[in-house]
Amino acid sequence: LSRARAAGGAFNYGSTGPGSMPHIATVALARSAGVAMTHIPFRGNAEAIVSLMRGDTSIFADQPGTLRANNLHPVAIFAESRVAEFPQTPTLREQGHDLVYSIWSGIYAPAGVAPEFIARVDAACAEALRVPAVVEGFSRLATPIVYRNAAEFAAFNRAELEKFRGVIAAAGIRPGD
């Protein structure tokens, strides 16, 4: 961040495209730190990593597995806590920025689906996430399993939506940026 501050806006960061998690998370970091950075969007992490390695961009946010596979060194983690793959790397919270941006997914259903069906899918998801092969697969991807039942996931989803809306609106991110 000190390099970005010293560059006065001439500090380039890569992302996997406008509105992507790396884009939004880095915008949030720049705003939290009060620094100007220039967004360089790419069509995926392969292009962004090449740009980083060439020195065209100075930072890029991605998942631990991608960093490890490309021999990249993280300087901060956008997670609640440190990750096992890089235990020496502090979270942004530890560095004074209350920023948690993680890749997550869920299962959605159209409005009006019978509650009994939702309950069956919810139970099946909870059970699937306890299967040893599934746990091992997520572990190999350095992806923690965080199960939320339907009500918890709905509340989490609303909170994430508001968090993203705030960053997107404050930064003026529009489709195609």
PLM regions and their residue ranges:
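Short gly/ser/thr-rich secondary-structure transition/capping motifs
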Residues: 55-60, 90-92
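A local structural motif
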Residues: 9-12, 31-51, 56-57, 142, ...
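Short helices/loops that flank or line small-molecule/ion binding pockets
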Residues: 27-28, 32, 46-58, 65-71, ...
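C-terminal lobe and pocket-closing loops
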Residues: 65-130, 162
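An extracytoplasmic/periplasmic, membrane-proximal ligand-sensing/linker region
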Residues: 32-35, 115-177
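Short beta-strand and adjacent tight-turn residues that come in two discontinuous sequence segments
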Residues: 42, 61-62, 77, 148
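Hinge/capping helix and adjacent helix->loop/strand transition within the periplasmic-binding protein
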Residues: 1-47, 102-137
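Phosphate-coordinating loops and pocket residues in cytosolic domains that bind phosphorylated ligands
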Residues: 2, 54, 94, 139-140, ...
